[in-house]
Amino acid sequence: MLEPVRQPVGVALRDAYPWPDLASLARTAEDAGFEALFLPEVGARDTLATLAALAGETSRIRLGTGVVPLPSRAPGLLAIAGATVQERSGGRLILGLGTG
C-alpha cells in the first residue's frame, strides 16, 4: 500500500493591496494552512521590509521573496535585510536569489 505524501502548498500575493488587506490576506493564508506566502521582488513596496512587517502579523507561515536579482541590490544590504527578516520571523524567511 502506498503512503500518502504531504505536499506543502504556498500562495503568491501581489503587494499592491492596501496594508490592512495585505496583512489580513497573510493571516488568512496562515489560518487556511498554507505552508508559505511569497511576495514579488518588483512591486509597490520593498519586499523584505514588507515580509518583516508580515512576520509580526503571522506566527507559522513561511515568508518568501520572488527571485531577487542579485545585481539589483547591494550584497551587504541584502544580507542585512534578509537577516533582519529571518530574526523577526523566527527563521521563516525563504530568500529567492537569481542573476537577473
Say what each PLM segment does.
Residues 1-65:
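N-terminal beta1-alpha1-beta2 module of alpha/beta enzyme domains
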Residues 2, 6-15, 72-100:
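Flexible, glycine-rich active-site loops centered on histidine and acidic residues
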Residues 43, 67-70, 74:
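Structured beta->alpha junctions
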